[in-house]
């Protein structure tokens, strides 16, 4: 279904000079947009009954390739200012996601309808499913996969695993409760 995009991403991964081509940049941005919408994932369940997952390396490569093609820019919200390459996610009302003040998610992170973000942070490539609460000061790292009806308690750190691209991200399966101040990293799989 996404074979053409996959081919372009794999070629650009092997030859970074191709990132100068606007068509290649568009392909990278398209993959990140699909991740943002939850239509592509950096990792996905293969057999949920056995808790088996596969890493979509080419999607992770696209996320990594997104960084060098994005220009640095100033972003403002009232008197607050940021200077970064990554846009922030927006349109939460239309997405059906509750987001309280001080919560931040980067564009390229999927947050499902019914999820709740307390003052927290969700990084690019992450997937947060419906009914999940990312509680106060919790962080969801790049490419982490968080299931349905999960509670990431206050101060939880879910590590991100962008590289190496073949490495499994942190996976928290459906209905898990991760207690306050826990740190889950380096491809851990909680089910």
Name each model-derived stretch:
Residues 1-97:
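Terminal amphipathic alpha-helical/low-complexity segments used for targeting or macromolecular assembly
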Residues 101, 106-107, 112-113, 117-119, ...:
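Left-handed beta-helix
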């Amino acid at each position: 279904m996404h074979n053409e995009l996959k081919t372009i991403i794999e070629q650009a991964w092997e030859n970074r000079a191709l990132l100068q081509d606007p068509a290649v940049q568009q392909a990278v941005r398209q993959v990140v947009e699909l991740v943002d919408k939850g239509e592509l994932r950096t990792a996905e369940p293969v057999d949920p009954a056995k808790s088996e997952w596969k890493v979509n390396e080419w999607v992770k490569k696209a996320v990594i390739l997104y960084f060098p093609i994005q220009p640095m820019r100033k972003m403002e919200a009232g008197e607050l200012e940021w200077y970064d390459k990554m846009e922030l996610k927006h349109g939460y009302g239309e997405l059906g996601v509750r987001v309280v003040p001080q919560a931040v998610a980067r564009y390229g992170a999927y947050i499902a309808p019914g999820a709740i973000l307390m003052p927290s942070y969700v990084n690019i490539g992450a997937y947060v499913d419906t009914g999940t609460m990312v509680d106060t000061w919790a962080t969801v790292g790049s490419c982490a996969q968080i299931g349905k009806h999960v509670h990431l308690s206050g101060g939880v750190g879910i590590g991100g695993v962008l590289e190496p691209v073949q490495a499994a991200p942190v996976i928290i399966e459906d209905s898990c409760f991760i207690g306050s101040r826990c740190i889950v990293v380096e491809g851990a799989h909680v089910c």
